[in-house]
A protein has these predicted regions:
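Cytosolic ends of transmembrane helices, especially the final helix of ABC transmembrane type-1 domains
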Residues: 216, 240, 254, 288-315
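An intracellular "coupling" helix at the cytosolic face of ABC transporter transmembrane type-1 domains
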Residues: 14-20, 108-109, 125-137, 141, ...
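Membrane-integrated ABC transporters
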Residues: 1-37, 52-62, 80-84, 88, ...
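ABC-type nucleotide-binding domain
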Residues: 331-576
Length: 576
């Protein structure tokens, strides 16, 4: 555990080292607090002794001293709390940002394989425990140093009482250690269960509309009830274990307190211990009897800290959470040419979606992909954006292998407008600024005009400052897609991918969007996935996909002649 703890504290220090002077001041405050904790009972005992001897003048001076000690203790407690909060806040913020950045760099296959709860719990709960480690150590260091001072004072007063306290510490320490080991194992299971429940609740909240429309409330609530019962059962099991040990240990404390009182009475009756020193020991006993708790709680929290650190290490360093890999080649400008050269890919090893797929796209051209669902149209877009990596073959942008290009050369030059675009829970203006923070109001207005969104925005009381809700919940499907199109126009990337982006639009708006796409042809390389063939008949080329291959490539008129599958789809659409 020591080796693991050393590694984890070194990791936490990376995020706390800028607050090192506050940490030093916190340790100094702790040191003074220890002195006060040891001295205060001595002064209190003297007050009682002097009062019993009617030495009122000395009592007055001692009372003033005790008052000053208490004031000093309050000030030091305040400073300790202040420094602790600053250190925690700064460490927590930096750690969360760093972990958030790491999560954004994970491969999509890793995101797909884990529930959102895995990342939410670690990003919130585990980071909090790591950020608080130095405050925990300092807090318990205060207790431990105070206990050492108290035990030293008791040793000077009477070695027999000291020996008794050591025996008491060993017995309670053994029980505390057993409790920590049992609770830590149960906590591992509880955290995993909590991740599963958090992920399911996230799905429930995001899919609440579909759940209502499908009348699936009962099924979801039944599943939620089952998972919550399982979680609460594990939570209760861990809590019961803690209570059982607390009952045993608390009862032992009471027995030990009774024994120490009997022991002191015996020593006083034999004139081997003065009443004044007995009062001092009694004042110390409240701390001394629970001395082992400080060490045990420190050990328990450090084990929790190690557990949280290891869970975060899994995301940052473990091969179980693979990161996206980019090359070092940077393109200052992208023309928009790209090529798929014998590319194969599957979301799992058993089944390939694309099989030796090859095609070339020239810059400033409009290419459409057509085919049945599941033939790999969206997969082509995902591979081009490097959301996934091909199993075999190469993807080239302007003649450079995508594996050699850096992140900016790919992601800053390709925009995908999906069938269900995610709209952030901010204003319309801020949604557009997400992709380009220095965008001007004129650019925003122009992008919304091209995307046929300007009339709708003008009808809103707050206009561009209207907050659209999580996922754009206050917008219709068509409005969300048009906002996504405006967002792509603001970004001004050279390659724009439309993945069924006009599927939720009415015919009038679809015509306007089609005109907007036609206006963009001279400046952009445009790729379109569409089931409505009427939206892509003016494309420069149409690629018909089947079973992971391109089986036909040409204009609309050419495909009607050479591709029976395309002709059949087009005739079926005309009949509708």
């Amino acid at each position: 555990m020591i080796k693991e703890l050393k590694k984890n504290i070194k990791f936490a220090w990376k995020y706390s080292k800028e607050e090192k002077w506050k940490l030093i001041l916190l340790v100094l405050c702790t040191f003074f607090h220890v002195i006060i904790s040891v001295v205060a009972p001595l002064v209190s005992a003297q007050v009682i002794v002097k009062l019993s001897n009617n030495q009122l003048k000395q009592v007055f001076y001692l009372a003033i001293a005790l008052f000053a000690i208490n004031i000093g203790s309050n000030i030091i407690n305040y400073l300790c709390g202040y420094f602790s909060q600053v250190i925690y806040r700064e460490t927590f913020t930096k750690l969360q940002l760093d972990l958030g950045k790491t999560i954004l760099r994970l491969r999509n296959s890793c995101i797909d394989a884990n529930s959102s709860g895995v990342f939410i719990e670690r990003l919130t709960g585990d980071t909090s425990k790591i950020a608080d480690v130095f405050n925990i150590i300092n807090y318990h260091l205060l207790d431990i140093l105070t206990d050492i001072g108290i035990f030293g004072a008791v040793f000077i007063i009477d070695i027999r009482i000291f020996a008794y306290l050591i025996l008491m510490v060993l017995i309670i320490g053994f029980l505390e250690r057993r409790k920590i080991n049992v609770v830590t194992e149960k906590d591992k299971v509880l955290r995993k269960e909590n991740e599963n429940v958090s992920g399911f609740i996230g799905e429930l909240v995001r899919g609440v509309r579909d759940i209502k429309m499908l009348s699936a409330e009962r099924s979801f609530l039944t599943t939620l009830r089952t998972r919550l019962i399982s979680l609460n059962k594990k939570r209760y099991d861990m809590s019961r274990t803690q209570r059982d040990y607390q009952l045993i240990i608390g009862s032992l404390h009471d027995v030990f307190d009774l024994i120490i009182i009997v022991l002191m009475l015996y020593l006083i009756s034999n004139n081997e211990l003065s009443i004044a020193l007995a009062l001092v020991v009694h004042n110390y006993m409240g701390r001394a009897s629970y001395a082992v708790n400080s060490y045990s709680h420190l050990l328990e929290q450090l084990k929790n800290f190690n557990l949280s650190a290891n869970r975060i290490f899994e995301i940052i360093y473990s091969s179980e959470f693979p990161k996206e890999k980019f090359g070092k080649h940077h393109l200052d400008s992208v023309e928009g040419n790209f090529e798929f050269r014998k590319v194969s890919f599957g979301y799992n090893e058993e089944e390939l979606v694309l099989k030796d797929l090859s095609f070339i796209v020239n810059s400033q051209s409009t290419i459409a992909f057509v085919g049945k669902s599941g033939v790999g149209k969206t997969t082509i877009f995902n591979l081009l954006c490097k959301m996934y990596e091909p199993s075999n073959g190469k993807i080239l942008i302007d003649g450079i292998d995508i594996m050699e290009l850096d992140r900016e050369s790919i992601r800053d030059n390709i925009t995908i407008i999906s069938q269900n675009p995610y709209i952030f829970n901010v204003s319309i203006r801020d949604n557009l600024k997400m992709v380009k923070d220095d965008v001007t109001d004129e650019e925003i207005v122009e992008a919304c005009r091209i995307a046929c969104l300007d009339d709708f925005i003008a009808s809103l009381p707050s206009g561009y400052d209207t907050v659209v809700g999580e996922g754009g919940i206050s917008l219709s499907g068509g409005q969300r897609q048009r906002l996504a199109i405006a967002r792509a126009l603001v970004q001004k990337t050279k390659i724009i991918l439309f993945d069924e982006a006009t599927s939720a639009l009415d015919n009038i708006t679809q015509t306007k969007i089609q005109q907007a796409i036609d206006n963009m042809k001279e400046d952009y390389t445009i790729l379109i996935i569409a089931h409505r063939l009427s939206t892509i008949i003016n494309s420069d080329r149409i690629l018909f996909l089947s079973d992971g291959h391109v089986i036909a490539d040409g204009t609309h008129e050419e495909l009607l002649k050479i591709c029976p599958e395309y002709r059949k789809l087009y005739e079926a659409e005309i009949e509708k």
